[in-house]
Amino acid sequence: MNFKEGEVLYFNKPLGWTSFKVVGHARYHMCRRMKVKKLKVGHAGTLDPLATGVMIVCTGKATKRIEEFQYHTKEYVATIQLGATTPSYDLEHEIDATYPTEHITRELVEKTLKTFVGEIQQIPPAFSACKVDGARAYDLARKGQEVELKPKLLVIDEIELLECNLPEIKIRVVCSKGTYIRALARDIGEALQSGAHLTGLIRTRVGDVKLEQCLDPAKFAEWIDQQDVEISD
C-alpha cells in the first residue's frame, strides 16, 4: 500500500466518534507505519457523532477524489421517534416539545413517506456545519442566536418503512449529497401533524461501498501492521 501516492479506505465510524477523530486516528497510524511526520488524509462526507456507518477516507494524491465520492448516492437506516422534538432534531439535545401521536397509523406513515420521494426542498438543521455569513450555523445556534438557513434542493430516491412500532419507526433512505436525515425526521414529523427526532442513524452504503466492506477504526492499528506498506525514504 502506498498512502502517499494515494489509497482509498472504508471505515465503519463508531458511535460517539467524530468524523475528524476517525481521520486523525487513521492518519496517526499511517504516519507511524510509514515513519513520516505528516500525510494528507481527508474524508468524503461527515457523519454526526451519534451516527455510525460507512465513511470513505482518502490519502495522499487520492484526496483529489474526495469530491467524486461526495456525489455518490448514500443509503441510511434511520430510527425516528414520533411525538417529540429536540433543537438539533436528534439526541444531542433534550426534548423541547411533545406532540400528539394517537392519530398516527402505519397506513398514514407509509402514505406520508411516499410524499418525500423525488426532488424535495429541505431546510438544513440550525445545528449543522452550514455557513451563515461566514460563520458555522452550529456556532451561532449554540450561542442562542436565531439561524435562518435557505432550503436546498435534494433528491430522495427511495424511502422504505422497515419497522413501525408507534410512536417509533425505522426507515431506509437512499438519497443525494447534502441530505440531512435529522432534517428529514423533522419534516416527516411535521407532515404527520406531530413532531419527530432522530434516535439512531446508520449509513449503510456510499455508492457501491457497503458496511460489510468497512474497517473498524478501533482495530486499524492492528490491521495496518499486517499490510505491506510503502515506507517513505
UniProtKB/Swiss-Prot annotation:
The active site is formed by D48 (nucleophile)
Q: GO annotations under biological process?
A: mRNA pseudouridine synthesis; tRNA pseudouridine synthesis
Query: Which CDD domains does the record associate with it?
Result: PseudoU_synth_EcTruB
Q: What is its EC number?
A: 5.4.99.25
Specify one Pfam family: TruB_N
InterPro entries xref list: PsdUridine_synth_cat_dom_sf, PsdUridine_synth_N, tRNA_psdUridine_synth_TruB, TruB_C
Q: Which enzyme class?
A: isomerase
Q: Which residues cross the membrane?
A: none
Record's family?
A: Belongs to the pseudouridine synthase TruB family. Type 1 subfamily.
NCBIfam families membership: TruB (TIGR00431)
- Biological role stated in the UniProt entry: Responsible for synthesis of pseudouridine from uracil-55 in the psi GC loop of transfer RNAs.
Task: Write down what this protein is called.
Answer: tRNA pseudouridine synthase B
Tell me the organism. Answer: Bacteroides fragilis (strain ATCC 25285 / DSM 2151 / CCUG 4856 / JCM 11019 / LMG 10263 / NCTC 9343 / Onslow / VPI 2553 / EN-2)
Q: What is the phylogenetic placement of the source species in the record?
A: Bacteria, Pseudomonadati, Bacteroidota, Bacteroidia, Bacteroidales
Gene encoding this polypeptide?
A: truB
